[in-house]
Amino acid sequence: MLIFFADPTKEICIIGSREDFGRLASLIRAAKGTMLSSQTGSPAPYDRLLGLIVIENKPGESVRFSVTQNGALLIVGDQSKLSILADNVFSISEADDSEGHWHVEYFPDHFFLAPDSFPVVFELTDAKRNQEFSSLQ
């Protein structure tokens, strides 16, 4: 799994395999945990690669994606709203399209996302292509 971050726009791009997204969905559903990601290669056209995902349960809060000062992707929210996110992330792992993607951005009255959440793109790639991509960068 690779996690790209653009500092000026706060955009996050998560590229992973079916297995990566299945593991991530399990952690999100549990509303706690951490997952390492590769920092091998260039972050271009983004500004940097993030090496860690941290998931935390925050009762009563909508889901928020942010980046900590030490470069971790932080995903927080109420367990019920994290569960909605987990269902969607898991569906990526089961997608028919081997290179599909899903945009998660706030809009007014979003059903699980907080207004100040950073925008995220989840992109599915096969494990071999993911490895090749990280070594080419």
Predicted regions and their residues:
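Positively charged, low-complexity terminal tracts
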Residues: M1-Q137
